[in-house]
Amino acid sequence: MRTLSDAFIPELPGYYKGKVRENYDLADGRRIIIATDRLSAFDIILTSIPFKGEILTQTARYWFEETADICPNHVLEYPDPNVVVGTRLDILPVEIVVRGYLAGTTSTSILTRYRRGEREMYGMRLPDGLRDNEKLAAPVITPTSKAADGGHDEPLSRAEILAQGLLTQAQWDTVSDYALKLFARGQARAAERGLILADTKYEFGTDKNGTIILADEIHTPDSSRYWIAASYEQALASGTRPDSFDKDFIRSWVAARCDPYKDPIPRIPDEIVEQASRIYAQAYEAITGKAFVPDLSGDTVLDRIRSNLVRFF
């Protein structure tokens, strides 16, 4: 399978490897961000999915353009389908997660905690009697800490964020306002295409002037939970998961076979990986309304990326 599992390019400076993306900091304040095909879930790398990095980059590109009127973003240019060059930012130490439904499979999701009997979480109280995947009265922000690689994200409340000095009051007011407006735009656009944007996460940073800027990715199948709207009511009534366009497909496959936070992860079969690749492509098409045509130039994905980044060497 044609995948990009690693994207180390020794000619580029300032290398940093994240869970999914590999970054290079240029001397002039720009950052080159390469989206690999690695699939991260449960705070680990599960496998690599063909064309995933290209799909994530192009989906985020669509959404950055669709939301540029709401808040500034880090994008400067796209020299390759897997690559964005952006303004280097100081990333704020809080991930801003917005949820419109009682859903999720991770340890920090409100559904997981709700099933354990918790009602007080993230500085809010949820009512009794909610069903799995039920729509909330209004979208809520459920922030988490940004764990170092290998660590686990931890739930935070607004009060804890301010008390710990992770964000100032002004920063919190700005990112929470941006996040809710971005989510509303995402839900509206998704609904036009027969999709439900159930939840998503945003990452913000500050530039050299202290301006808060949207970074990383936005409304991609990795950072978001998308459901097919036509499947929702029946799934809610039957207590099953709505048909989805996101990495919940593999997360659910893994979670059905082990406790991913404690047990060894079973090998994910090739047919599951290939199905996941098709789901990512279908997600791109459903979200953007455009056909996904992968760029197959170059002997390998990394060869193509290298040739497109030569001017940065």
UniProtKB/Swiss-Prot annotation:
Q: Which CDD domains does the UniProt entry name for this protein?
A: SAICAR_synt_Sc (cd01414)
Phosphoprotein found in the keyword field: no
- Does the keyword field hold Transcription regulation? no
What pathway or pathways are given for this protein in its record? Answer: Purine metabolism; IMP biosynthesis via de novo pathway; 5-amino-1-(5-phospho-D-ribosyl)imidazole-4-carboxamide from 5-amino-1-(5-phospho-D-ribosyl)imidazole-4-carboxylate: step 1/2
**Pfam families on file:** SAICAR_synt
Tell me the enzyme class. ligase
Cellular component (GO) terms are: cytoplasm
Recorded GO molecular functions are:
ATP binding; phosphoribosylaminoimidazolesuccinocarboxamide synthase activity
What SUPFAM superfamilies does the database record attribute to this sequence? SAICAR synthase-like
Catalytic reaction list: 5-amino-1-(5-phospho-D-ribosyl)imidazole-4-carboxylate + L-aspartate + ATP = (2S)-2-[5-amino-1-(5-phospho-beta-D-ribosyl)imidazole-4-carboxamido]succinate + ADP + phosphate + 2 H(+)
> E.C. number, please?
6.3.2.6
Q: Which Gene3D superfamilies match?
A: ATP-grasp fold, B domain (3.30.470.20), Phosphorylase Kinase, domain 1 (3.30.200.20)
* Domain of life (superkingdom): Bacteria
Q: Which keywords does UniProt give here?
A: ATP-binding, Ligase, Nucleotide-binding, Purine biosynthesis
Q: Which GO terms describe its biological process?
A: 'de novo' IMP biosynthetic process
Family named by the database record: Belongs to the SAICAR synthetase family.
PANTHER family named in the record:
PHOSPHORIBOSYLAMINOIMIDAZOLE-SUCCINOCARBOXAMIDE SYNTHASE
Alphabetical list of NCBIfam families matching this protein: PRK12607.1 (NF009251), PRK13961.1 (NF010568)
- Protein name in the entry: Putative phosphoribosylaminoimidazole-succinocarboxamide synthase 2
Q: Which organism is it from?
A: Mesorhizobium japonicum (strain LMG 29417 / CECT 9101 / MAFF 303099)
What's the encoding gene here?
Answer: purC2
